């Protein structure tokens, strides 16, 4: 496969993944996304109060279960709240704010696919192998689903992919400063 065809296929797969994930994130019902309603309490709290929640606060705690996702790491909720705050400048629509919050997962999934292609390019001499790796990871049904709703998982997969990529680069360059910093 020549270089031009490879990059065309790679960018089309990345764009296709983004379109599928973003499109699904727009139409996915909250009740079909596990715990999303409860996870959404965190970015909603951040946007409305302009402060980080304490997990013991009533407004972020589930009354039936008695716990809150604010007791867990919530970096993705902070990122989602930025997208929600930007969206709230234009509209107060609950659907638009939900889609804005889901954008964190969509972009994390898309970023993961980009990094998987970079990993494939580092590991394999043949471009087809890198392309196949991207196809396998990017179009696993569960991965596409994780990239469509508010959760920590898609961002966690993205950061692990980044760690693996820079680890591979570091091993190839004897961990020069550039590869250690990223």
Mark where each language-model region is:
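Transmembrane-helix signature of polytopic, membrane-embedded enzymes
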Residues: 8-14, 92-95, 116-139, 157-158
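Extracytosolic helix-loop segments that constitute the early lumenal/periplasmic catalytic or substrate-binding loops
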Residues: 38-71, 75, 85-88
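Transmembrane-helix motifs of polytopic, lipid-linked glycan transferases
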Residues: 99-124, 162
């Amino acid at each position: 496969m020549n270089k031009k065809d490879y990059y065309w296929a790679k960018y089309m797969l990345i764009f296709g993944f983004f379109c599928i994930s973003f499109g699904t994130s727009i139409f996915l019902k909250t009740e079909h996304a596990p715990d999303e309603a409860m996870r959404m309490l965190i970015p909603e709290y951040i946007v409305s109060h302009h402060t980080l929640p304490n997990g013991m606060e009533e407004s972020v705690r589930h009354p039936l279960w008695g716990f809150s996702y604010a007791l867990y790491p919530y970096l993705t909720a902070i990122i989602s709240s930025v997208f929600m705050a930007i969206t709230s400048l234009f509209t107060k629509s609950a659907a638009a704010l939900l889609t804005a919050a889901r954008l964190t997962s969509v972009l994390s999934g898309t970023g993961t696919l980009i990094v998987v292609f970079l990993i494939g390019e580092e590991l394999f001499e043949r471009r087809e192998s890198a392309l196949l790796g991207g196809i396998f990871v990017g179009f696993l049904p569960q991965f596409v689903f994780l990239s469509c709703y508010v959760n920590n998982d898609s961002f966690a997969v993205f950061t692990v992919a980044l760690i693996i990529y820079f680890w591979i680069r570091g091993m190839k360059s004897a961990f020069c400063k550039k590869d250690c910093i990223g």
